[in-house]
Amino acid sequence: THLTTLTEGATINPFDNKVVIIDEAHNFVSRIVNKLKSRKKTSLSVKLYEYLMDAIDCRVVFLTGTPMINYPNEIAYLMNLLRGPIERVLINTSSVISWDEGMMTSFFRTLKDIDTIEYDSIKRLIKLTRNPPYFETILNEKGERIAVKYNKDFPQESDILKWVDTWRSKFQEKVSGIELNPLEKLQKEDLECLPTKFEDFANLFLDGLNIKNALLFQRRIQGLVSYYKGADERLVAKEVNPDKRLVKVPMSTPQFLRYLEKRWKEIQMDSKKGRSKTELGEDFSSYRTITRLACNFALPPELDQKDISKEQLQEEDFQKQELDAFEEISKDPRKFLTLENLNNYSPKMLEILKNIKKEIGDGPYFNKQFIYSFFTTLEGAGLFGLVLETNGFQKYKLIKEQGIYIEDPSLKPGVPCYAVYSGENVDERDYLRQIFNNKYSSDFPTTLKQSIKEPNRLCIFIASKAGAEGINLVNVRNVHIMESQWNPAIVDQAIGRAIRICSHASLPLEQRTVDVKIYISVFSEEQQKSIDGPNIVPIRRNDTMLKRYDVEQPTDTFMTTDEYMYDLAYRKGRISKNISLLLKQSAIDCEIHRKLHSKEQPVIQCMRFDTTTKSEDLAFKPSYLLEEKDTLYLRNIIRKSRQLQKIRIKGLAMILDPVTNDIFDFVAFEDNQRLLKIGTKISPTEIHFLV
């Protein structure tokens, strides 16, 4: 493999002394967590993770707009990769006549690469961490550390255990009465910036859907994050009615009964596996797959497969196994997919169809529609293509003549077309995307381009999860998400296919809008209370749980699988947004971009340490286990009151503390009364500004 070549047969670390840049880093981290959860520790992503964590003098740069995809503790893996392992050496003593911590600290402060110094007087143990490579400590005249400075010529032994031997003899000379253990008896710890184990992360930082110990989280990630909002909002299409994204579609009676049959099978399977139904740290990619499909389309009994194995459930696109049923529907689609029949088998698809007909407008310039489904064929993207074809639309087709692609001349003029972005022919898929966008690359076949009679006829683009990744669409006016997902990142990625920088630049200003709809099947009021149906009582008992979305207070509700998935995504989304806010507030450039980000909601209040904090104080301790929780940390902060004055110097407004002569930024003070020190008044006519 390529990794074997890079590592020369696992004999070297390819990331030693390297700068590693990873785009879309959330995908990389998510794969690591998924593989570790499934105990696949030999997978490529896990091996890369281990090589990065073990690399010597490696710098990692991650580019991402998404802090987490599936699990809240993904952010811990991401931050740990950026920070690297916090190496700490544990130095036992073989002989102690006099344990003088002050004398030892005085010696250690002469070593320019020491970061933290800790002692265990009972075990006679010294614990030391070091600055990153090439960073040396700067001391003031009192011997206090006031800064660290990069110095490319500053040497450092890469092995922290061997490093002890570089100063051992000097220590014995300066500190009498203490004998250090030899190198072979020293120990090294690799500490984490944040806990990666889900239970540990949740216990330390999660409080329901909120974040606890936010200050602790922010202190430990200091210096790791940069945040810039990005392009001018005027370059991005605006989503209209974002508060009306969710479309709840009540089930029909036939669909409800079919749903109950399938749900009972799932409950029995879950009970055998002992599966939890509310754990945020669980993989839901194959959870309730049978009823997720039933929420889209309730197959009539004569077409439904009798049994679905456990192995099939582990395949996210297992619906391919139901191609026989799909082919049966294809033979006589009017039997199942007319408006009347859709009302029985899939009220949800009927609702999507109605909205498309309402929004698509009149030709020849149809409003472009993007339809996304997690599922590929039956009950998903492929089936909805048949729904369109049965109800006044036509499938866009390319044909080959003598090896050359052209538009199918048999297409009906003036009838809007759809295309499903699937299939193994990569070229054909990309041609369809370019025709939909009406924007062609330089290598697009000239013959095909000349054969296109109505450039805007292909106006409906359907894609599944597998197909939607990485594609860019242009001038989409409506996005239809066919089912709820188990995490909001999937929905955001799908919407991101249609709303991109300058994706609507060719439209008039008033048309640069996108309406997004997420459709979920729900129980009607009658079905919520019904006692008629197979196994309805045990199903209701099992599936009644706290509903948190779309309610003022969490309420026990009998929810469909669609609703449950949406509620799960809502919970994950709340946590993700809260973590994202902490990242933005902790960014090293937060103050620099404060004005640019001033319109964001919730408001970004840049993290800052208390004004009594001294330069030698630590932002965080090496081990998160020894950190003060926020309640104790805040209790120990010395609270001071100041009488401040607003002054103007050469027309510039500033804030002055007349007692200390500290000068603070006026704009920052207006922003939630934040005191951002920018200098010191040293005379009535002179100010020394911080550099």
Positions of the model-derived regions?
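Short conserved active-site loop signatures built around small residues
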Residues: 479
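The feature captures the C-terminal accessory region of ATP-dependent helicases
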Residues: 596-691
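Helicase motor interdomain insertion/brace
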Residues: 1-472, 511-530, 536-632
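Conserved SF2 helicase motif VI
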Residues: 487-509
